[in-house]
């Protein structure tokens, strides 16, 4: 099965910080054409962090279009080998991961036994994968950050 194409989704161009070009998280990249794509996608000047970015929706062709990041207002990154997945939510839609198709996707990932760190603006939350112990690295990280784990 082939990968999804980004198409008009440019959410990673907004949410993700890009230190190489001093782009803060939550602001549009100057090379992004919102709703159209990255203006330098195939250019050698494209920042390395962008080249290395792993969007779960793009790389999971079995996920339906309703879970495309620009539709659910967050992206999920990480690979099968990742200890946990990152869920990065557009700060303009802080509840997106808790309602509608966004919640469906979070529940699907959790029920598959995957741990998630959810980032919403300056807030971070941990969601424990179903029937999986919490890794010590996550416990230590959350204690350092002073956050409480969300355990359902």
Predicted segments, located by residue:
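Short loop/turn segments that flank or connect secondary-structure elements
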Residues: 1-152
């Amino acid at each position: 099965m082939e990968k999804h194409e980004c198409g008009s989704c440019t959410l990673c161009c907004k949410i993700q910080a890009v230190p190489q070009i001093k782009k803060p998280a939550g602001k549009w990249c100057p090379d992004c054409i919102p709703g159209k794509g990255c203006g330098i996608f195939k250019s050698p000047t494209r920042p390395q962090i962008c080249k290395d970015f792993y969007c779960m929706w793009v790389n999971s062709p079995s996920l339906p279009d309703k879970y495309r990041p620009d539709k659910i207002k967050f992206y999920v990154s990480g690979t099968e080998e990742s200890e946990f997945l990152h869920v990065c939510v557009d700060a303009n839609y802080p509840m997106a991961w808790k309602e509608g198709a966004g919640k469906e996707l979070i529940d699907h990932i959790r029920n598959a036994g995957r741990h998630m760190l959810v980032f919403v603006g300056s807030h971070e939350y941990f969601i424990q994968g179903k029937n999986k112990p919490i890794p010590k690295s996550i416990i230590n990280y959350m204690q350092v950050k002073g956050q409480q784990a969300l355990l359902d």
